Protein backbone atom coordinates (compact mmCIF):
# COMPACT_ATOMS: atom_id res chain seq x y z
CA UNK A 1 0.00 0.00 0.00
CA UNK A 2 1.33 3.43 -0.98
CA UNK A 3 0.97 6.20 1.59
CA UNK A 4 0.58 9.79 0.46
CA UNK A 5 0.70 13.05 2.41
CA UNK A 6 -0.49 16.52 1.48
CA UNK A 7 -0.38 19.65 3.62
CA UNK A 8 -2.37 22.85 3.12
CA UNK A 9 -0.84 26.28 2.84
CA UNK A 10 -1.58 28.82 5.53
CA UNK A 11 1.39 30.97 6.45
CA UNK A 12 2.55 30.51 10.04
CA UNK A 13 -0.36 28.13 10.65
CA UNK A 14 1.58 25.37 8.88
CA UNK A 15 2.99 24.99 12.38
CA UNK A 16 -0.12 22.91 13.19
CA UNK A 17 0.74 20.16 10.65
CA UNK A 18 4.33 20.22 11.90
CA UNK A 19 3.10 19.47 15.42
CA UNK A 20 1.00 16.61 14.05
CA UNK A 21 3.97 15.21 12.13
CA UNK A 22 6.10 15.50 15.27
CA UNK A 23 3.54 13.41 17.16
CA UNK A 24 3.49 10.81 14.38
CA UNK A 25 7.28 10.50 14.42
CA UNK A 26 7.34 10.11 18.21
CA UNK A 27 4.54 7.54 18.16
CA UNK A 28 5.93 5.43 15.32
CA UNK A 29 9.63 5.89 15.96
CA UNK A 30 10.09 6.54 12.25
CA UNK A 31 10.81 9.59 10.12
CA UNK A 32 8.04 11.09 7.97
CA UNK A 33 10.18 10.63 4.86
CA UNK A 34 10.20 6.87 5.56
CA UNK A 35 6.49 6.64 6.38
CA UNK A 36 5.06 8.18 3.19
CA UNK A 37 5.69 7.63 -0.50
CA UNK A 38 4.33 10.76 -2.21
CA UNK A 39 3.99 14.35 -0.99
CA UNK A 40 2.22 17.53 -2.12
CA UNK A 41 2.51 21.05 -0.75
CA UNK A 42 1.54 24.62 -1.51
CA UNK A 43 2.63 27.98 -0.13
CA UNK A 44 4.19 27.62 3.34
CA UNK A 45 3.79 23.83 3.32
CA UNK A 46 6.17 23.72 0.35
CA UNK A 47 8.84 24.96 2.77
CA UNK A 48 8.03 22.22 5.28
CA UNK A 49 7.91 19.34 2.80
CA UNK A 50 10.96 20.49 0.87
CA UNK A 51 12.84 20.61 4.15
CA UNK A 52 11.66 17.18 5.28
CA UNK A 53 12.58 15.58 1.97
CA UNK A 54 16.08 17.04 1.75
CA UNK A 55 17.96 17.72 4.98
CA UNK A 56 15.78 18.76 7.92
CA UNK A 57 14.02 16.77 10.64
CA UNK A 58 10.59 17.68 11.99
CA UNK A 59 12.22 18.87 15.23
CA UNK A 60 14.56 21.11 13.27
CA UNK A 61 11.71 22.49 11.18
CA UNK A 62 9.69 23.39 14.27
CA UNK A 63 12.55 25.68 15.27
CA UNK A 64 13.43 26.73 11.73
CA UNK A 65 9.90 27.86 10.95
CA UNK A 66 9.70 30.07 14.02
CA UNK A 67 12.96 31.77 13.09
CA UNK A 68 12.06 31.99 9.40
CA UNK A 69 8.69 33.60 10.10
CA UNK A 70 10.27 36.42 12.10
CA UNK A 71 12.54 37.18 9.14
CA UNK A 72 10.17 36.93 6.19
CA UNK A 73 7.35 38.80 7.94
CA UNK A 74 9.52 41.72 9.01
CA UNK A 75 8.81 45.28 7.84
CA UNK A 76 10.94 48.32 8.53
CA UNK A 77 9.13 51.55 9.37
CA UNK A 78 10.54 53.00 6.18
CA UNK A 79 8.98 50.24 4.07
CA UNK A 80 5.65 50.52 5.88
CA UNK A 81 5.44 54.20 4.94
CA UNK A 82 6.82 53.65 1.44
CA UNK A 83 4.26 50.93 0.70
CA UNK A 84 1.40 53.02 2.05
CA UNK A 85 0.79 50.42 4.75
CA UNK A 86 0.53 47.78 2.01
CA UNK A 87 -1.87 49.75 -0.18
CA UNK A 88 0.63 50.74 -2.89
CA UNK A 89 3.04 47.80 -2.77
CA UNK A 90 3.05 44.31 -1.32
CA UNK A 91 2.83 44.18 2.47
CA UNK A 92 6.37 42.80 2.67
CA UNK A 93 9.46 43.28 0.57
CA UNK A 94 10.74 40.07 -0.98
CA UNK A 95 14.37 40.77 -0.02
CA UNK A 96 14.13 38.95 3.30
CA UNK A 97 12.24 35.89 2.10
CA UNK A 98 14.57 35.49 -0.88
CA UNK A 99 17.69 35.59 1.27
CA UNK A 100 16.17 33.34 3.94
CA UNK A 101 15.17 30.63 1.46
CA UNK A 102 18.61 30.79 -0.15
CA UNK A 103 20.15 30.37 3.30
CA UNK A 104 18.08 27.33 4.29
CA UNK A 105 18.03 25.54 0.91
CA UNK A 106 21.21 26.78 -0.75
CA UNK A 107 21.95 25.16 -4.11
CA UNK A 108 19.54 22.24 -3.66
CA UNK A 109 17.55 21.51 -6.81
CA UNK A 110 14.29 19.73 -7.55
CA UNK A 111 16.26 16.59 -8.33
CA UNK A 112 17.78 16.62 -4.82
CA UNK A 113 14.41 15.90 -3.20
CA UNK A 114 14.52 12.30 -1.96
CA UNK A 115 10.87 11.33 -2.47
CA UNK A 116 8.26 12.34 -5.10
CA UNK A 117 6.98 15.84 -4.28
CA UNK A 118 4.56 18.15 -6.07
CA UNK A 119 4.68 21.88 -5.28
CA UNK A 120 1.71 23.89 -6.53
CA UNK A 121 2.07 27.43 -7.83
CA UNK A 122 0.10 29.71 -10.16
CA UNK A 123 1.42 31.42 -13.29
CA UNK A 124 -0.03 34.90 -13.82
CA UNK A 125 1.35 35.02 -17.38
CA UNK A 126 -0.72 32.06 -18.57
CA UNK A 127 -3.42 32.24 -15.87
CA UNK A 128 -3.05 28.60 -14.93
CA UNK A 129 -1.81 26.37 -12.15
CA UNK A 130 1.73 25.04 -12.38
CA UNK A 131 2.76 21.79 -10.72
CA UNK A 132 6.47 21.48 -10.04
CA UNK A 133 7.02 17.73 -9.79
CA UNK A 134 10.46 16.93 -8.43
CA UNK A 135 10.69 13.78 -10.56
CA UNK A 136 9.35 15.09 -13.86
CA UNK A 137 10.21 18.66 -14.78
CA UNK A 138 12.00 19.89 -17.88
CA UNK A 139 14.16 22.35 -15.91
CA UNK A 140 15.92 21.31 -12.72
CA UNK A 141 15.20 24.55 -10.90
CA UNK A 142 16.74 25.52 -7.60
CA UNK A 143 14.44 24.39 -4.85
CA UNK A 144 14.38 27.74 -3.08
CA UNK A 145 13.08 29.45 -6.23
CA UNK A 146 10.23 26.98 -6.67
CA UNK A 147 9.31 27.47 -3.01
CA UNK A 148 9.53 31.23 -3.47
CA UNK A 149 7.04 31.09 -6.33
CA UNK A 150 4.63 28.94 -4.34
CA UNK A 151 4.78 31.28 -1.31
CA UNK A 152 4.09 34.53 -3.19
CA UNK A 153 0.79 35.18 -1.45
CA UNK A 154 -1.01 38.07 -3.21
CA UNK A 155 -0.78 41.36 -1.27
CA UNK A 156 1.86 39.82 1.02
CA UNK A 157 4.69 39.45 -1.52
CA UNK A 158 5.30 40.46 -5.13
CA UNK A 159 5.08 37.69 -7.76
CA UNK A 160 8.28 35.75 -8.45
CA UNK A 161 9.77 35.63 -11.95
CA UNK A 162 11.16 32.19 -12.85
CA UNK A 163 12.06 31.85 -16.53
CA UNK A 164 8.84 32.54 -18.43
CA UNK A 165 6.68 32.08 -15.33
CA UNK A 166 5.35 34.88 -13.15
CA UNK A 167 4.50 32.88 -10.06
CA UNK A 168 2.19 33.50 -7.14
CA UNK A 169 0.88 31.38 -4.30
CA UNK A 170 -0.86 28.26 -5.60
CA UNK A 171 -3.28 28.63 -2.69
CA UNK A 172 -5.29 31.13 -4.74
CA UNK A 173 -6.58 28.06 -6.59
CA UNK A 174 -6.82 25.68 -3.65
CA UNK A 175 -5.08 25.19 -0.33
CA UNK A 176 -6.43 21.65 0.04
CA UNK A 177 -4.38 19.44 -2.27
CA UNK A 178 -6.26 16.20 -1.54
CA UNK A 179 -7.52 15.63 -5.06
CA UNK A 180 -4.30 16.77 -6.72
CA UNK A 181 -2.16 14.54 -4.51
CA UNK A 182 -4.36 11.52 -5.14
CA UNK A 183 -4.37 12.07 -8.91
CA UNK A 184 -0.60 12.61 -9.02
CA UNK A 185 0.01 9.48 -6.97
CA UNK A 186 -2.08 7.32 -9.27
CA UNK A 187 -0.20 8.73 -12.25
CA UNK A 188 3.14 8.00 -10.57
CA UNK A 189 2.50 4.56 -9.04
CA UNK A 190 -0.29 3.22 -11.25
CA UNK A 191 -3.96 2.44 -10.65
CA UNK A 192 -3.25 -1.07 -9.47
CA UNK A 193 -1.81 0.17 -6.17
CA UNK A 194 -3.78 0.67 -2.96
CA UNK A 195 -3.43 4.03 -1.24
CA UNK A 196 -3.67 5.63 2.17
CA UNK A 197 -3.97 9.40 2.07
CA UNK A 198 -3.35 11.78 4.96
CA UNK A 199 -4.42 15.38 4.34
CA UNK A 200 -3.41 17.98 6.93
CA UNK A 201 -5.12 21.35 7.27
CA UNK A 202 -3.59 24.44 8.85
CA UNK A 203 -6.47 25.47 11.08
CA UNK A 204 -9.89 26.73 10.03
CA UNK A 205 -11.63 29.75 11.53
CA UNK A 206 -15.35 30.22 10.93
CA UNK A 207 -16.69 33.63 12.07
CA UNK A 208 -19.78 33.26 14.24
CA UNK A 209 -21.20 36.70 13.45
CA UNK A 210 -21.65 38.65 10.21
CA UNK A 211 -18.73 41.01 9.61
CA UNK A 212 -18.85 44.61 8.46
CA UNK A 213 -18.14 44.82 4.75
CA UNK A 214 -16.15 48.06 4.45
CA UNK A 215 -12.68 48.23 2.92
CA UNK A 216 -10.86 47.76 6.21
CA UNK A 217 -12.94 44.68 6.96
CA UNK A 218 -11.49 43.02 3.86
CA UNK A 219 -7.86 43.68 4.70
CA UNK A 220 -7.64 40.10 6.01
CA UNK A 221 -9.00 38.70 2.73
CA UNK A 222 -6.04 36.33 2.35
CA UNK A 223 -6.84 34.77 5.70
CA UNK A 224 -10.49 34.39 4.73
CA UNK A 225 -9.71 32.90 1.33
CA UNK A 226 -7.18 30.54 2.90
CA UNK A 227 -9.80 29.24 5.31
CA UNK A 228 -12.29 28.83 2.48
CA UNK A 229 -9.85 26.98 0.26
CA UNK A 230 -8.83 24.67 3.09
CA UNK A 231 -12.37 23.85 4.20
CA UNK A 232 -13.51 23.12 0.65
CA UNK A 233 -14.07 19.38 0.52
CA UNK A 234 -13.37 18.23 -2.99
CA UNK A 235 -16.52 16.45 -4.10
CA UNK A 236 -14.55 15.03 -6.98
CA UNK A 237 -12.24 13.27 -4.53
CA UNK A 238 -15.16 11.69 -2.72
CA UNK A 239 -16.39 10.41 -6.06
CA UNK A 240 -12.93 8.97 -6.72
CA UNK A 241 -12.99 6.77 -3.62
CA UNK A 242 -12.35 3.66 -5.64
CA UNK A 243 -11.06 0.39 -4.31
CA UNK A 244 -7.47 1.58 -4.53
CA UNK A 245 -7.96 4.52 -2.10
CA UNK A 246 -8.29 2.33 0.95
CA UNK A 247 -7.93 5.00 3.64
CA UNK A 248 -8.50 8.75 3.59
CA UNK A 249 -7.90 10.95 6.63
CA UNK A 250 -8.44 14.70 6.67
CA UNK A 251 -7.22 16.37 9.88
CA UNK A 252 -8.24 19.97 10.49
CA UNK A 253 -8.09 22.02 13.67
CA UNK A 254 -11.02 24.38 14.23
CA UNK A 255 -10.02 27.80 15.55
CA UNK A 256 -12.12 29.87 17.96
CA UNK A 257 -10.19 32.98 16.90
CA UNK A 258 -8.48 33.65 13.62
CA UNK A 259 -4.70 33.50 13.41
CA UNK A 260 -3.37 35.76 10.69
CA UNK A 261 -1.05 34.15 8.17
CA UNK A 262 1.86 36.41 9.17
CA UNK A 263 1.41 36.44 12.95
CA UNK A 264 4.80 35.12 14.06
CA UNK A 265 3.91 35.80 17.69
CA UNK A 266 1.24 33.09 17.67
CA UNK A 267 3.39 29.94 17.98
CA UNK A 268 2.84 29.48 21.71
CA UNK A 269 -0.89 29.97 21.16
CA UNK A 270 -0.85 27.35 18.39
CA UNK A 271 0.91 24.86 20.66
CA UNK A 272 -1.82 25.32 23.27
CA UNK A 273 -4.55 24.91 20.66
CA UNK A 274 -2.87 21.78 19.31
CA UNK A 275 -2.52 20.19 22.75
CA UNK A 276 -6.22 20.76 23.41
CA UNK A 277 -7.11 19.34 19.97
CA UNK A 278 -4.88 16.31 20.60
CA UNK A 279 -6.80 15.43 23.76
CA UNK A 280 -9.91 14.86 21.63
CA UNK A 281 -8.20 13.36 18.58
CA UNK A 282 -5.44 11.16 20.00
CA UNK A 283 -7.33 7.97 19.17
CA UNK A 284 -7.63 8.96 15.52
CA UNK A 285 -3.96 9.90 15.31
CA UNK A 286 -2.91 6.65 16.98
CA UNK A 287 -5.04 4.70 14.52
CA UNK A 288 -3.32 6.46 11.62
CA UNK A 289 0.08 5.71 13.15
CA UNK A 290 -0.78 2.02 13.46
CA UNK A 291 -1.99 1.76 9.87
CA UNK A 292 0.96 3.54 8.27
CA UNK A 293 3.43 1.28 10.08
CA UNK A 294 1.73 -2.00 9.16
Language-model features and meaning:
Residues 4-7, 37-43, 117-121, 196-207, ...:
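Extended hydrophobic secondary-structure segments that form protein cores and membrane-embedded regions
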Residues 2-6, 12-103, 142-147, 196:
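Patatin-like phospholipase
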Residues 80, 111-190, 252:
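Active-site gating loop/helix substructures
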Residues 17-20, 52-55, 132-135, 178-180, ...:
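Short coil/turn segments at secondary-structure boundaries
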Residues 158, 162-164, 172-174, 189-195, ...:
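C-terminal helical/tail subdomains of lipid-metabolizing enzymes
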Residues 28-33, 102-117, 186-191, 282:
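Surface-exposed acidic, glycine-flexible loop patches that form ligand/cofactor-binding
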Residues 9-12, 44-47, 54, 124-126, ...:
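Conserved beta-strand elements of beta-rich interaction domains across eukaryotes
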Residues 91-115, 210-240:
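Surface cap/lid and interfacial helix-loop subdomains adjacent to catalytic sites
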Amino acid sequence: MKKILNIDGGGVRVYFPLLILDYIEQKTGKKIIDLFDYFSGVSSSSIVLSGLLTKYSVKELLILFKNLSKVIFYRSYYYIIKSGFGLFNSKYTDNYINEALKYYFGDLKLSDVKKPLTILSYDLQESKSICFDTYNFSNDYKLWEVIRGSTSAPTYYPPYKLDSYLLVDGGIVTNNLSELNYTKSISYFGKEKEFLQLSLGTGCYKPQKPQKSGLLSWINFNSISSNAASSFETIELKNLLLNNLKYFYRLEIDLDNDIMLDDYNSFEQMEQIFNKWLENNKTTLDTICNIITE
